[in-house]
Amino acid sequence: MSLLLEMFTYPFILRAFVVGILVALCAALLGVPLVLKRYSMIGDGLSHVSFGALSIALACGWAPLPVSIPVVVLAALGLLRMTERSRMGADAAIAVVSASALAVGVVVTSLTTGMTTDVDSLMFGSILAMDRADVALSVGLCAAVLVLYVLFYHRLFAITFDESFARATGVKVGLYNTILSVLTALTIVLGMRMMGAMLISSLVIFPALTAMTLLRSFRGVVICAAGLSVVCFCVGLTGSYLWGTPVGATVVLVNLAAFLLSRGVMKLKRAS
């Protein structure tokens, strides 16, 4: 218990908790429509884009967020346009962008000396990466995502399940898809430095899948995913501090355990 109390005396831990909880909440709320629209791997693609952008920023000595945010937002919008206006499917478009951006990041880091530690934290995350700017941005991002759900819940529901019907009823499908893409891009950028490029997409996918295993209504899945994501992050970050393991990997394993537990519960429920 004393070790747990000691954990909260460190400012960087407190910042990591605040940013992580808000990013986990945003990722889960955005993840539900993305998973249902079969666009869930956008998180993986955008994290690789962010890795490439951050690698260039570090190599040039620039501030990371001002470089990575516009690049990842543009990549998200580009992916959206590629899937809407070309014959390329969403999975193929994400694969092309993801592989290209990852290749850029790897080449840049290989040509730059003294970046081994920075690359390690980019790939697998670090709680030391959070600063006050991350806290402020995560608060603003969370507010934007909550406003989207509170004010435009029914429109979001419509574009998630039937874009043609939503378009026929006057919903601006393109606008809401763009908003989803931009918010997802911001979530990935903010969460990647703590979770790592290889693992940040799990915050988008796991809570939504776990909630969909347990519940059937859209509203129930959204609320359950949000709660699960926050709880799993808190357990993962605490476990990471106690056991000295990487934050991103620990949070993913906690999410995996929750997913497997939900599957087991549902199988027992069907068998009884």
Predicted regions located by residue number:
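Short loop segments and helix-boundary regions at transmembrane helix junctions
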Residues: 32-115, 211-223, 240-243, 266-268
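Membrane-interface capping segments at transmembrane-helix boundaries
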Residues: 154-155, 264-272
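C-terminal binding/interaction regions
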Residues: 3-9, 123-127, 228-265
